[in-house]
Curated annotation (Swiss-Prot):
It comes from Brucella anthropi (strain ATCC 49188 / DSM 6882 / CCUG 24695 / JCM 21032 / LMG 3331 / NBRC 15819 / NCTC 12168 / Alc 37). Residues 1-31, 209-228 are annotated as: Disordered. It comes from the Bacteria. This is Protein GrpE. The keyword S-adenosyl-L-methionine does not apply.
Length: 228
């Protein structure tokens, strides 16, 4: 292309005589011009290649930075989620520590309350009716028991009242069964010893009696008899 272009610009070069100084000088100038043009074209091609390489390198760099940015963003989101989970877990642990801090103490106090109640129940009713000092002492013991239970309640200890409810092995301890065809099976019909809970946890299960032979049991028995 460059040779054809040079020939088109200098159509008489081939007519020059190299032995003629003037023609030889013209040929030298033409050769210099040709070389300069080729060098300029080469530099332009190199510059274009370098520009393309720079563009490719920049594009690759941008792609790498975008990938790094995505990875860092993902790491940041995971770290934020972990921090939030840690905050919630710590908050829950602190709340549990506050709620259940008195668990062992409360359990011991319930034993004391049980002893006070047994002492009161051991006093004959006729003795209370005839002995004023004994009656006064019994009233004092009862007030002490009541105040103790109220103090425990202020610290999150609640009395379980399961009578009439379905038996729950997490909060109740079955001591005996009571035949009762009018109630569904495993209904709490009697509380032998009060149970207590603190927060969502059982502090002491209620000792109870549960019904047996209710409607469901009767239906089952009927089915068994029919099969027999």
């Amino acid at each position: 292309m460059a040779d054809e272009k040079n020939k088109s610009q200098n159509p008489d070069l081939e007519q020059r005589d190299i032995n003629n100084p003037r023609d030889r000088e013209a040929l030298n100038r033409a050769a210099d011009d040709f070389l300069k043009a080729r060098k300029a074209e080469a530099r332009a091609e190199v510059a274009e290649d370098e520009a393309e390489a720079a563009v490719d390198e920049t594009a690759n760099r941008i792609a790498m930075l975008e990938a790094d940015n995505g990875e860092l963003k993902d790491q940041l989101l995971r770290a934020a989620a972990e921090m939030e989970n840690l905050r919630k877990r710590t908050q829950r642990d602190v709340q549990d520590a506050r709620t259940y801090a008195v668990t062992n103490f409360a359990r011991d106090m319930l034993s004391v309350s049980d002893n006070l109640r047994r002492a009161l129940d051991a006093i004959p009713a006729d003795a209370l009716a005839t002995d004023a000092s004994l009656k006064s002492l019994a009233d004092g013991v009862e007030m002490t028991e009541r105040a103790m239970l109220q103090a425990l309640e202020r610290h999150g200890v609640k009395k379980l009242e399961p009578e009439g409810e379905k038996f729950d092995p997490n909060f109740h301890q079955a001591m005996f069964e009571v035949p009762n065809p009018d109630l569904p099976n495993n209904t709490v019909v009697q509380v032998v010893q009060d149970g207590y809970a603190i927060g969502d946890r059982v502090l002491r299960p209620a000792m109870v009696g549960v019904s047996k032979g209710g409607p469901k049991a009767t239906a089952d028995n009927g089915a068994s008899e029919g099969n027999g």
